[in-house]
Amino acid sequence: MNNNQLSAQLARQLGAHRHLLVAFSGGLDSSVLLHLLVGLRQQLPDLQLRAVHVHHGLSAFADQWVTHCRQQCVAWQLPLVVQHVQVDSQQGGIEAAARAARYSAFASTLAADETLLTAQHLDDQCETFLLALKRGSGPAGLSAMAAQTSLGNNHLLRPLLGHSRQQLEAYAQQHQLSWIEDDSNQDPRFDRNFLRLQVLPLLNQRWPHFAAATARSASLCAEQEQLLDELLAEQLHNLLDEDRALAIDGLLTCSAARRFALLRRWIALFGVTMPSREQLQRLWEEVALSREDAEPQLQLGQYQFRRFRRRLYLLPLMADLREISLSWSLDDSLMLPDGLGELVSGEGDICLRAPQSQQKVSIRFSAQGKHRILGRAHSRPIKKLWQELGIPPWQRERIPLIYYDDQLIAALGIFVSEAGQTPEGQQPWRLHWRKK
């Protein structure tokens, strides 16, 4: 394929995307992609380009790579953003952690109207397919990398997926491009390197079109997944409420295959790592089908599955706030923990009996014993009150509770206790919960 054909193909893949952020490591693949786009900019004057380089801090040469990328971007007259990240190798291994840190940096760099372009090629697609095969993945995992997908509210394009590394090398040599070589790419302890250095050369020697064949298989798997998406979309929509909680009863009569397919598509809505088949089985048996009076939960990375009133919820892990007690002088606003916002005194639509001069006001996140709230004739245990008011267990510990000394006055936004009622003829104390 000649240069004109490459440029024309790239322009077709871009479609209407004109504001582009290019992931630029300085290696062969991203150097070729960026060079192609710089050339395409001559033909498409409305094309706006930026590059982003992620400094992982894992190599002794990382600073030199930044220098190379800066020099290249100056020569090609386009802005470069350098993002420094910290890689936590405890989170799924060094490769997965570096990738997670990298894509987090991309997401934070993207402007609202920008599309991210990455330079994965045909050989990368083959490696991804084989790694998914090694993990025992189904059609979703074997679909490998999509040529176009979403990244948060932005789009991600991989325009080089149809081209081999050999083709990219030929292009780079023809245009006398310079690029860096990551020293870690020669370490076979990493799974991708092991495949690239030791496995794929043998496969390609025996079957020269092996990478292209695996790419076709990945594409067929992706088609099957798309078909399932279309066939199950209406049923999934009918099982969801406005909070994207999933109705358990609607899954009871499904076959196991259909149930797991629906669970996977529900989980995919949240953009989290897809659980294994074993984890899905545990989700169904230990959470969905647990006793009615239980409060089951199952952790998945930084997320958790919970159940409430015959519905499944997928939630981020939350800090335990039950032991926290915050004194409040009322002269200033009070910042709440764990991103819950702040409380502002003297304004707002929450009206309570004003504290007496000697009473100490505090904010807590747990309560014990029985309480009588406005609108109820009798005192009730706090757990029963939460249940009757329809508050899920994980929300109960994130609702600020107003105390005067050790007396519960109100659960903000939920109820006011009898002790918090403003006596007739007195001015109430107003406050506002400013949520983030």
UniProtKB/Swiss-Prot annotation:
SMART domains linked to this entry: TilS_C (SM00977)
Alphabetized SUPFAM superfamilies for the sequence: Adenine nucleotide alpha hydrolases-like, MesJ substrate recognition domain-like, PheT/TilS domain
GO CC field: cytoplasm
Listed name of the protein: tRNA(Ile)-lysidine synthase
GO molecular function: ATP binding; tRNA(Ile)-lysidine synthase activity
Organism whose genome encodes this protein: Serratia proteamaculans (strain 568)
InterPro entries referenced in this protein's UniProt entry, alphabetically: Lysidine-tRNA-synth_C, Rossmann-like_a/b/a_fold, TilS/TtcA_N, tRNA_Ile_lys_synt, tRNA_Ile_lys_synt_N, tRNA_Ile_lys_synt_subst-bd
Keywords: ATP-binding, Cytoplasm, Ligase, Nucleotide-binding, tRNA processing
This protein's encoding gene: tilS
